[in-house]
Amino acid sequence: MVDITAPVLDNHQVGPRLHLMTLSAPEIASSIKPGQFVHMQIPGMEGHILRRPFSVYAADVSEGTIEILYQVVGFGSERMTKLAPGDEIAPKLIGPVGHGWAAPEKCERALLVGGGVGAAPLFLLFEQLVAAGVDVTVVL
């Protein structure tokens, strides 16, 4: 787990009340496991003591980036929609947090089931399973 300042590379709407944020976070991208998450201090909300947890939707080790898929449900997530490339998640982004999931070693087929924004962390597991040659069915 690391504490870093993470520049925003992209942040755009992908659906009704759904946004996808790309952050430069090579230390996290290189060590994140499916099911792990990050704690984010949202700029402009430094008065709030607790950081907010967000699942990591995708990670690109070669680019050193992570992607956060989030739903706008309140003041904090509404504030996140205003972040633009060049803004920084500061003072710190903490992660990866949690134990995460590991694909079974001997697995031929897998069924991944998720709903809403809670399905976001399944994407990393999907990628890992497909790379291992597993036949994956996804139900969202």
Where is each model-derived feature located?
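Ferredoxin-reductase
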Residues: 2-87
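FNR/FR-type flavoprotein reductase catalytic core
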Residues: 75-140
